[in-house]
């Protein structure tokens, strides 16, 4: 999962999602897609619900289409995969965790956005097998140690930090928010001495070597 500090800019969520979508889920003959505002959704896209909607119905079905469970409510931060776009019924189907499927009327697509990249703030409370953190310069009030801490601790196995080493060092030093009693600062400071290194964690322990993740493992 790509986690970035900002929505706008060269490495912001909006630009990264556009680039990653074209690389990871490019258009193909026969692959359904739907444009809505500034977004373009395709079957196979990773998407995220961006507001609570207690009225959305979900259901879990067997491969034969029999409903085995159903309920109400999809919430801010829920992630899923676009599984169907039906221009006849004007609906887009997303499959969330536990095989919950939701059909969105096209007029509700404003509640979805691509989720190949999300902001670090939006990732709070979630975990991913592997995390990629792109860093360029940014406002000091945003680029601080706690933000870096939040991003790194979202990963269960591997963290890759790419970009500007000076920005990385400045974020370590910037305690703009309340200090945490943690050894993370020392750990990432040691990592920062080698700008060509890749920082990886497995079960909370820093690794000296790691296997480069596949594109699938980063999603």
How would you describe each model-predicted region?
Residues 1-74:
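Conserved helicase/translocase motor-coupling segment
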């Amino acid at each position: 999962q790509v986690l970035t500090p900002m929505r706008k800019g060269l490495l912001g969520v909006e630009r990264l999602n556009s680039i990653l979508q074209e690389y990871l889920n490019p258009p193909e003959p026969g692959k359904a897609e739907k444009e809505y505002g500034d977004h373009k959704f395709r079957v196979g896209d990773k998407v995220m619900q961006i507001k609570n909607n207690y009225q959305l119905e979900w259901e879990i079905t067997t491969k034969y289409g029999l409903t085995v469970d159903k309920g109400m409510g999809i919430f801010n931060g829920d992630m899923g995969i676009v599984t169907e776009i039906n221009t006849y019924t004007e609906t887009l189907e997303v499959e969330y965790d536990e095989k919950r499927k939701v059909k969105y009327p096209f007029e509700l697509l404003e509640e979805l956005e691509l989720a190949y990249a999300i902001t670090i703030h939006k990732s709070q409370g979630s975990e991913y097998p592997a995390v990629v953190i792109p860093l360029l310069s940014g406002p000091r009030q945003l680029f601080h140690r706690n933000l870096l801490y939040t991003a790194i601790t979202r990963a269960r196995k591997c963290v890759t930090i790419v970009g500007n080493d000076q920005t990385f060092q400045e974020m370590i030093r910037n305690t703009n928010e309340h200090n945490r009693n943690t050894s993370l600062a020392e750990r990432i400071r040691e990592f920062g001495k080698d700008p060509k290194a890749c920082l990886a964690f497995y079960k909370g322990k820093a690794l000296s070597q790691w296997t480069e993740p596949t594109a699938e493992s980063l999603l």
